[in-house]
Amino acid sequence: MKSFLKYTLATITGIIIASILFLIVLIASLSAIVSSGNKPVSISNNSILVLKAGVPIPDRGDQNPLSGIDIVNMTLNPAPGLNEILHNIEKAGADNKIKGILIENGLLPAGWATTEEIREALLKFRENGKFVISYSDYVLTQECYYLATAADKIYINPSSMLEFKGLSSEVMFYKKALEKIGVEVQVTRHGKFKGAVEPFILDKLSDENRSQIKDYAGSIWNQVVADISKSRNIPAEQLNRLADNLDGTLASKALETNLVDGLIYHDALVDTLKTLSGIKKEKDLNLISMTKYDKVPDPKMTVSGKNKIAVVYASGTIVDGKGNETNIGGNYYADVISKARLDTSVRAIVLRVNSPGGNAIASDIMWRELDLAAKAKPLVISMGNYAASGGYFISAPGTKIYADPMTISGSIGAFGLIPNLNKLLEQKLGLTTDIVNTNKNSDFPSVFRPMNPYEKELMQMSVENIYTEFVNKVASGRKMSPEAVDNIGQGRVWSGTSALKIGLVDEIGGLKDAITAAAKLAGVETFIVKELPVFEDPYTRIISQLSGEVKMSILKKELGESVKYYNMIQELKSMTGIQTRLPYFIDIH
């Protein structure tokens, strides 16, 4: 027996030691890969920069040290962010070693505003006398085609297809599904256009929501058509006819209607690139990825100096507390903005907003620090794909607001949402709860019972108060009357183009324009761009990332298919309380 215990304990000890050693080796290996990825590189003459469409493009390059790691080849290939893509395109325009840009097109889950910014950068790149070629082997989606029209020539595979059909918005409604699993969503709201709650309480779009979606989708489409018309020299009326009839779907029809310039295979593309680069042998063709080119030093980049422009990236849903890299923690970002305000070397702040909104109190906490910052130094707002509801709330104090023509903005409104999980827990899962209160409403708000009339009235009052505050703060920031803001508010969503017309933004432009404006307002000509927030060190983040993956793996294993209910409940829990949030479920494609 003693011998058995001895060997058992030895085995367990060995497993523990081996696991610890494996973890140490794994972390060391990952750290080595991350460190090696930061070394500067050089490129040869006649190089071609490759813009590979096919992965999501965040406003800021992925700060996750595990992102893009190829364990087999021990390399780091993170997806570049919009900031890196724009900088690389501008840098390549002045780089004598770069002959042109190849857009490897296909799927582009980037958002219309992001795509438009990249497209404008490509058009400016061409002004340097360099070429831009777009090629797609498979289906060229509509968003990708819009990007491709910035190129000198558009080529697609003879067997591929092109998507050109106009915009569509599909909204999924959860009401019946929630009823089936026993979840009741209790809603209060202000704003007849506040459509964020509709998927939980309706089976289809309200007339007001349908109208606003049609308006802002129409505004975006008109911009797309106008830009393509200018680049391809095709009248807008003809483009709309092509979209109505799906005439450009087949490759042969796309060529016939001048939507593309040629139907070629990849070997012919290589020949084209060789000719444009002035080389004879394919082995001398030097294609450079965005990730690699980002490590090429920029001779024009200021590396030192006393003047800084802080660019604060605020992407994702606004939540309370610290948040994480996929959302905006109100308290954390307030602290980041406060430090930028107090830093005398920071001459101006640019807030890059790409958010559908979120928690009302978290938005207000951020607003306060942004308002203080705007009183201390220039605060310029740059709006990405979304800057709506809470996203617009935090933009309101801006000295100057820039939006893309295709930005989804506005949505000045508020709503409250509390799920009642009583039936789900009791009837579906067999769980019951009992409550002991010291006072009448001690357990409010509770997800285990429905609200009583008094609580509903209290929630509505809270929503009304938040809406009034929202309107007043926008009125103050935009130098408008509260009545004027209310007229364009009520939860209504606007495109960037429309927002400019009604005074919600000052200029149409992208992130680069906002940074330039901030420097001008601050009276500085040379400056360093300081990107914020600065996240925790790679070693801490690697461990955190690994633990997060383990947690989700365990949940999936234990819950199986029921993990979808867990995810749904987590989403509902995050929306508990008063929200200033866009109906982000809406996808325009």
Q: What is the predicted role of each segment?
A:
Residues 2-42, 46:
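N-terminal type II signal-anchor transmembrane helix
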Residues 230-231, 261-305, 415, 471-477, ...:
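C-terminal long alpha-helix characteristic of the crotonase
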Residues 361-365, 498-501, 543-545:
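Short glycine/threonine-rich loop-to-helix capping motif typified by GTGT followed
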Residues 40, 49-171, 300-424, 464:
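Cleft-lining beta-strand/loop regions that shape enzyme active-site pockets
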Residues 300, 304-309, 313-340, 344-345, ...:
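Intrinsic disorder and flexible/low-complexity segments
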Residues 42-45, 301-306, 427, 523, ...:
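Extracellular/periplasmic catalytic domains that process cell-envelope and extracellular macromolecules
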Residues 175-274, 422-502, 506-508, 512-517, ...:
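Charged, glycine-interspersed solvent-exposed loop segments at helix/strand-loop junctions
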Residues 241, 353-358, 386, 412, ...:
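Acidic/histidine-enriched alpha-helical segments
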